[in-house]
């Protein structure tokens, strides 16, 4: 296309000799320029996504629908204040309850159970105040823009407009990308930028782009070490299939990226747990399910918890998860159908490239299988939704799965097949957008309304709780944490023991449970055995004051 435009520029005339309007010619050049397509596609997605994040959460959110987001935000605030990701534990805590969910008590303080890179980076950014908070919101938006632009670079110039559909076609990944306080969001942002840099390497041949792609993957792997082995294997296989002659440079860059990811976590593990090879999440798993036998190879237990944190599911569990999250979750079946495009794409490659890419596809399938479990949020529900845990774990797979149908359409020369495939991809993208904006309990509209509602409720509840008091709650820590000290309710007997110990230490205690669940009723019964009662403070909201009755 660029050649056609430049040939017209030399004479200033069109094909029949008439003078060409200079303004029209400049417009034609701009409209056909591949670089302009990249900028346009990226700018549109960046503006849409940044607006969505700011509309949903605001610039400095403290109310979240998920405790995972609250963990990262809380730890970031502590780091911003210079005290590290630690909460003081005022009492012995054998039940491991004197902290919010997804934290763990280590001695006289508690720390998050997540890999530390995400909340350390967030904490350092929040030290920049408004600028840092804007960057946290803008980074995932930039990732979406980079993914769309990277897809465009993989497409022929005449069909780069197809890249406009790529983020929406991977709608579960888009949903989790735009929840910036989830620790999956920086991983997906890193993958998106890696796709852009990798595509730039393939288009320009400059090895610096490959180094940048693997640096991005190294950051993503540092944020989520449980994805690291899969990310590096995929990067190695895709890169070797694309340019086998550069195998030495590829191996070296992948190894350097792995060292970068590993070093960051080893250093922060030592700061948090005191042991470089002992991560907080591994300690939490050991405490919940029992420690694994000692291994002669240091770090082997941690490696297993990273590769297969939940083991391999049974056929019944795996098939049910496949039905929910690959067949019936909105228009997701169209994304699965689009993988048929892998067949013609692979047939065009050399035998060596087909073997390497086939191995990469097998690794992606194994990864997806290892994350399909019913002992997760949404596992007990008969339907699939993007806000469930399994789609969150599978977001890198959804992201990469959006590429084959678009790459096939970019190369397809059959007019009817191109039109039919284009209609299916447009339907997938449109259906995905509808899921993200209209689906109950998972749309950005729902998240926006939740933040507004709970922010108002937080102001009202916080006025009824004295400063310094602790509040036991089963699930409401995700929006209470910023105004009150929150501890958690789990097993009723153990929670009653913890409350009794804290009450005997003369601490001012409250229980917050909006609904009288079976767990709450059992807790009341256990407290009664210990001469502890709950006095209603705000019956409408479920706030109770703990009262230690005289014997």
Predicted regions and their residues:
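Signature aromatic-anchored transmembrane alpha helix within multi-pass, membrane-resident enzymes
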Residues: 34-42, 158, 215, 236, ...
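Membrane-embedded, lumen/periplasm-facing catalytic core of multi-pass transferases
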Residues: 426-479
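Interfacial juxtamembrane loops and adjacent helix segments
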Residues: 58, 73, 77-118, 122-125, ...
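Hydrophobic, aromatic-rich transmembrane alpha-helices
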Residues: 142-149, 236, 240, 320-364, ...
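Hydrophobic/aromatic-rich transmembrane helices and adjacent perimembrane loops
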Residues: 184, 229, 379-412
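Multi-pass, polyprenyl lipid-linked donor-dependent membrane glycosyltransferases
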Residues: 67, 135-141, 161-169, 173-193, ...
